Amino acid sequence: MDVVLQYADKYVFDTFYGKIAESFDSSSSFANTAVNSTTLGLAEKVNFAITSGLLDRNNVWRQFTSLFLITWIMGTLSYFLSASFAYYVYFDREEARRHPKFLKNQEHLELMVALKNLPGMAILTAPWFLAEIRGYGYVYDKLDEYGYFYLFFSIALFLLFSDFLIYWIHRALHHRWLYAPLHKLHHKWIVPTPYSSHAFHYLDGYSQSLPYHMFPFFFPLNKYVYLLLFGSVNYWTVLIHDGKYFSNNAVVNGAAHHAAHHMYFNYNYGQFFTLFDRLCSSYRQPDQELFDAELRNEKLQEQRIRFMETVQYTVEGKDDRTYASKKDN
């Protein structure tokens, strides 16, 4: 994240904090220094701001604020662009809307929930990035510093480490003490769309992202690989909610496996793989009609929904959702 912050400082934040310095008049604390900032041009004020103690690039509060803004703005843009790409390019909107469990105005609701909670996730995530750029952890610069074998091994280790911890965090969020206040919001979307990918309570989203940020504090990780992985896992979150069932892979926890989680609640907690679901007896094979349209029929769908409603009542109690289908209102 230090690379991102360096470029952000150079092209955005130096000027941004310079403008803050400019806003102080001669009666402010800035004017009480040896340099009278009100007599300087913008370029000099920018330089004054970044060399003063409060707005220096290395000041911890400036770094925290900058990292929060980067995480919030870039996270929001990444979510909106990737989810919109999936939604408008290949997501089958008509088929999703025909499902009896699709909510009224669902896409709008998903988007609003995500936009409301992304700032909270960002402010909780910023301290991890702050610790990383201030030298804590094991993030390293050169690609070959630990050898290329370890470089690729660290990617596999990152995925396994994250998947293991996310599995247990996600499963814990289904405990009755945590489900209603935190995780139920994300399960409002029984038939997910790409916009549901980040539509959850900020503490829910943050807790499931913790393993990504914890990893470089336990294992060496190249900083460029870290950025690549962080971007990739965010896009993966969109992919497993996009309703595009490319393959029925027994190892990878794809969109079909995650669709089963949203539909049946207590299965397929993994993020990337099915390994820990299989080991811990929470694996459910995706419904085969997701892959073969010829298997789909109204009778089978009604059977699936009856089972889902039984599980849903056990987990949540009375259903308070408002569905788009008139017969379910």
From Swiss-Prot:
Motif (Histidine box-2): 183-187
Enzyme class label: oxidoreductase
Intervals of motif Histidine box-3: 257-262
Keyword Iron: yes
Membrane-traversing stretches: 67-87, 149-169, 210-230
Pathway: Steroid metabolism; ergosterol biosynthesis
Compartments it resides in: Endoplasmic reticulum membrane; Golgi apparatus membrane
Reaction(s) catalysed (UniProt annotation): episterol + 2 Fe(II)-[cytochrome b5] + O2 + 2 H(+) = 5-dehydroepisterol + 2 Fe(III)-[cytochrome b5] + 2 H2O
Enzyme Commission code(s) on record: 1.14.19.20
InterPro entries associated with the record: Fatty_acid_hydroxylase (IPR006694), Sterol_Desaturase_Related (IPR050307)
Cofactor: Fe cation
Effect of deleting the gene: Abolishes the production of ergosterol when erg31 is also deleted. The double disruptant also leads to susceptibility to cycloheximide and to staurosporine, but does not affect tolerance to nystatin and to amphotericin B.
GO biological process: ergosterol biosynthetic process; sterol biosynthetic process
Membrane-protein topology: Multi-pass membrane protein
Sequence ranges assigned to domain Fatty acid hydroxylase in this UniProt record: 156-281
GO molecular function annotation: C-5 sterol desaturase activity; delta7-sterol 5(6)-desaturase activity; iron ion binding
Motif Histidine box-1 boundaries: 170-175
Entry keyword annotation includes Lipoprotein: no
Cellular component terms per the entry's GO annotation: endoplasmic reticulum; endoplasmic reticulum membrane; Golgi apparatus; Golgi membrane; membrane
Cysteine disulfide partners in this protein: none
Keywords for this protein: Endoplasmic reticulum, Golgi apparatus, Iron, Lipid biosynthesis, Lipid metabolism, Membrane, Oxidoreductase, Steroid biosynthesis, Steroid metabolism, Sterol biosynthesis, Sterol metabolism, Transmembrane, Transmembrane helix
Coiled-coil residues: none
Family: Belongs to the sterol desaturase family.
UniProt remark on domains: The histidine box domains may contain the active site and/or be involved in metal ion binding.
Miscellaneous comment text of the record: In Aspergillus, the biosynthesis pathway of the sterol precursors leading to the prevalent sterol ergosterol differs from yeast. The ringsystem of lanosterol in S.cerevisiae is firstly demethylised in three enzymatic steps leading to the intermediate zymosterol and secondly a methyl group is added to zymosterol by the sterol 24-C-methyltransferase to form fecosterol. In Aspergillus, lanosterol is firstly transmethylated by the sterol 24-C-methyltransferase leading to the intermediate eburicol and secondly demethylated in three steps to form fecosterol.
Protein name: Delta(7)-sterol 5(6)-desaturase erg32
Organism expressing this protein natively: Schizosaccharomyces pombe (strain 972 / ATCC 24843) (Fission yeast)
